[in-house]
Amino acid sequence: LMEARRCKKIYLPFFLCDSVTGACERSGAEIEFYHMDEGLHPVLEERTLPEGEYLYLVNYYGQLTDDKIRKYKKIYGNIIVDHTHAFFQKPLPGVDTLYSCRKFLGVSDGAYLSTDAELEPEKKPLDHSMGRMEHILGRYEYDAGTFYQKMLDNAANYHEMEIRRMSRLTGNLLRTMDYSGIKARREQNYR
């Protein structure tokens, strides 16, 4: 996305996953970190960002409603929304939006991107995820604690990994998932 948008500078929150920071560093874009208020909203000067500059917004706990996202889009112009923790919140037209399958659906890799940018995914290498499945599959036969270190090691590897296309294994697993059932269970657990 950063390549397609020709991103020269990105504003990131201090409270952010290393894999995002690593991807931004590898893109060559200048990074400026910003603080957030107690509601996890950016504390930044309100201004339209020039071409090539983007504000990265993370929807940590559903605090970014559609109306708030539209407000940030109107103020800053160039925004990227990270719905890693709000997987079932629909993307808005004209707003680049990321969703992490790995963090939300229990697969070893993969993400969805909603954008109108012209991408060339075929130029990215295909990921192979079989070797990163042990900690996920092991939890079904043993306890999560047994595979905790493997999960941490797996997550650490993403910081240095280049952007790849989703593995065929992950794509096949995601096609078998009952998304409406998962959403209903998540909402029930929230109550």
Predicted regions: what they are:
Residues 3-78, 86-87:
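PLP-dependent aminotransferase-like
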Residues 50, 97-100:
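Short, hinge-like loop/turn segments at secondary-structure boundaries
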Residues 55, 79, 97-98, 111:
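Short, well-ordered beta-strand core segments
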Residues 89, 93, 103-191:
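Active-site region of PLP-dependent enzymes
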